[in-house]
């Protein structure tokens, strides 16, 4: 059994989780046969990590997030295969939609002024190669975003977060790895989770 991965990234409140659910429905119920027998969604950080941090009363670090992803992959029964690794003529059995992955880890670490430990850099690079591609949902009007995890109106700055994502995407262009990241502009006045998911599904057909 093999698996393929795609990631959904973007600022808090842009709608990643809702879009992931819609995308799963589209891929499983499209008229033409989907190449995947199963489509699954995995949210990061995992509930286990979030609960442990809450019980310990501590904030999660970039290293915590990376270990969380690495541990999840380690306990999966399917082998992890890089998208650019030649394989036999066997179609992937399962598609995993990753709700957040390494891009968010790097973005939020930068916003916290946190340096990713040198020992974690190889893990960051390895995990970054797992998804076939990463769809980055970018809000057209970031100032309208809200996050239920930040009840204090001063606790979440969506414009600063969006700017951080834009900087990382710009760096991806410079480093010639932009093909790994596909920006999707989200216009809250016109777009719906379904229409965004449909756009992603169409982009996936071309991959």
Give the role of each language-model region.
Residues 8:
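Hydrophobic anchor at the beta1->P-loop junction of P-loop NTPases
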Residues 14:
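ATP-binding Walker
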Residues 17:
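Walker A/P-loop
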Residues 21-78:
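Conserved substrate/cofactor phosphate-moiety recognition/catalytic segment
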Residues 60-128:
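Glycine-rich phosphate-binding loop used to anchor ATP phosphates in small-molecule kinases
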Residues 11:
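P-loop (Walker A) phosphate-binding loop of NTP-binding proteins
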Residues 150-207:
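NTP-dependent small-molecule kinase module
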Residues 108-173:
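A glycine- and Lys/Arg-enriched "phosphate-lid" helix/loop adjacent to the NTP-binding pocket
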């Amino acid at each position: 059994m093999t698996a393929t991965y795609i990631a959904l990234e973007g600022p808090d409140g842009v709608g990643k989780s809702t879009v992931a659910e819609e995308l799963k429905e589209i891929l499983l119920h499209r008229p033409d046969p989907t190449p995947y027998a199963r489509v699954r969604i995995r949210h990061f950080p995992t509930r286990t990590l979030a609960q442990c941090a809450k019980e310990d009363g501590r904030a999660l670090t970039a290293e915590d997030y990376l270990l969380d992803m690495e541990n999840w992959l380690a306990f999966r029964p399917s082998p992890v295969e890089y998208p650019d690794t030649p394989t036999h003529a066997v179609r992937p059995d399962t598609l995993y939609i990753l709700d957040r992955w390494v891009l968010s880890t790097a973005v939020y670490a930068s916003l916290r002024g946190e340096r990713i430990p040198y020992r974690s850099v190889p893990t960051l690079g390895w995990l970054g190669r797992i998804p076939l591609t990463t769809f980055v949902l970018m809000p057209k009007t970031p100032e309208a975003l809200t996050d239920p995890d930040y009840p204090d109106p001063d606790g979440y700055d969506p414009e600063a977060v969006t700017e951080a994502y834009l900087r990382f995407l710009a760096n991806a262009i410079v480093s010639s790895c932009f093909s790994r990241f596909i920006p999707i502009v989200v216009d809250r006045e016109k777009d719906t989770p379904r229409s965004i998911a449909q756009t992603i599904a169409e982009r996936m057909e071309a991959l």
